């Protein structure tokens, strides 16, 4: 069943529901939460860290840029930047190590024993990525293994100590990398992979350029077609949710395989906190102005719509918190308890007054003083 979203509700702003707003210099490239710390990096090369409870800036560093992707564990932030991958101590912002790669650094994922990183080379003659590499780096910063890939990896997941990569042209399909080499596997769906993630139960999910989704469990794959445009964004938990270039948001079979149609291409989609005990799904789209939507994951019913003046380009969520980074460099944090409390006070039929909005801005500023 296809539903329309965002056509009947009076809309509050993202700022109205944000318990913390901070800035990173330039367009946001990534945002993450690690424990009680909020970290973000920008296309211009800035990386900063704030304490979530107080809002205080803990540290800020500047790199050449652009930053592109990040992952973390309890001690370190790992992020790709230009042709390098960095390991930064979360507690201090000090750099533990930096490894220079070949080509542009792309994706990074942390495993129990190493850090997997992908890089690629763009061929201007064919207007596509012709070469790629995958790197296995230990926690001391030593490169343990490197392998060349046919084309660029558009998704990267850690699975049982190996790297799982979703590939675009010319190979398509996916690859499994380990120190013994790279194994290429074909899928029933032959179109390029545009997104991918790992399910909590260990399965791997890939989104394709034609709107199909392939789910792999125990070496057995199944494919479903959701539309005729590319999968643009994807998130995984116990099930999966995807956003299409056409504006469709859809879920996996265990969540009912429902669909919602937004007004424009989906920029980000993520599981996150909700207004009730059922997990929420958040997604954003853009059409001269931004729309951020919260829906019930079980049936796809719209719970909340927020406006934002700048395009959302990055997102990260935990059970209790969701963070959005926009193209202007602003980071907005929504916490579950604050979300529920303000929803009760800010009904969709009553937009917050200018005076109340300014007061909230002052409170957020004091939180970081």
Where in this protein do the model-derived segments appear?
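A short beta-strand motif characteristic of beta-propeller blades
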Residues: 16-23, 56-61, 94-99, 141-147, ...
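Short, solvent-exposed loop/turn segments at conserved positions within beta-propeller repeat blades
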Residues: 79-80, 124-131, 168-170, 285-290
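WD40 beta-propeller blade core
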Residues: 48, 86-87, 135, 173-175, ...
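Loop/turn-rich, solvent-exposed surfaces of beta-rich toroidal or solenoidal domains
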Residues: 260-295
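Repeated scaffold domains used in trafficking and secretory/extracellular systems
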Residues: 26-32, 64-74, 102-112, 149-160, ...
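Hydrophobic beta-strand positions that form the internal "hydrophobic ladder"
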Residues: 38, 77, 115, 163, ...
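Blade-level signature of beta-propeller repeat domains, shared across WD40, Kelch, NHL, RCC1
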Residues: 308-369
């Amino acid at each position: 069943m296809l539903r329309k979203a965002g056509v009947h509700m009076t809309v509050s702003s993202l700022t109205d529901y944000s318990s913390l707003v901070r800035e990173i210099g330039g367009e946001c490239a990534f945002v993450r939460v690690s424990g009680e710390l909020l970290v973000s990096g920008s296309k211009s090369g800035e990386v900063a860290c704030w304490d979530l409870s107080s809002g205080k800036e803990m540290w800020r560093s500047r790199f050449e840029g652009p930053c592109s992707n990040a992952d973390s564990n309890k001690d370190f932030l790992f992020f790709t930047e230009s042709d390098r991958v960095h390991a930064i101590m979360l507690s201090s912002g000090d750099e533990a190590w930096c490894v220079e790669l070949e080509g542009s650094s792309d994706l990074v994922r942390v495993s129990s024993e190493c850090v997997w990183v992908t890089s690629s080379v763009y061929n201007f003659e064919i207007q596509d990525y012709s070469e790629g590499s995958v790197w296995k780096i230990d926690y001391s910063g030593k490169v343990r293994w490197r392998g060349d890939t046919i084309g660029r990896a558009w998704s990267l997941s850690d699975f049982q100590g190996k790297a799982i990569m979703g590939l675009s042209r010319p190979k398509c399909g996916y690859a499994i990398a380990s120190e013994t080499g790279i194994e290429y596997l074909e899928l029933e769906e032959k179109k390029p992979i545009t997104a991918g993630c790992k399910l909590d139960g260990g399965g791997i999910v890939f989104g394709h350029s034609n709107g199909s989704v392939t789910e792999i469990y125990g070496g057995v794959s199944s494919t479903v077609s959701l539309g005729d445009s590319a999968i643009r964004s994807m998130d995984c938990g116990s099930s999966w949710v995807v956003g299409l270039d056409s504006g469709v948001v859809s879920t996996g079979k265990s969540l009912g395989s429902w669909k919602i149609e937004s007004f424009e291409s989906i920029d980000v989609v993520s599981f996150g906190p909700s207004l009730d005990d059922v997990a929420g799904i958040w997604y954003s789209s853009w059409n001269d102005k931004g729309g951020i939507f919260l829906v019930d994951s079980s049936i796809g019913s719209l719970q909340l719509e927020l406006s934002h003046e700048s395009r959302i380009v990055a997102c990260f969520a935990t059970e209790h918190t969701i963070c959005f980074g926009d193209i202007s460099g602003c980071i907005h944090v929504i916490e579950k308890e604050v979300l529920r409390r303000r929803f009760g006070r800010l009904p969709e039929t009553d937009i917050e007054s200018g005076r109340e909005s300014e007061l909230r801005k002052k409170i957020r500023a004091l939180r970081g003083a």
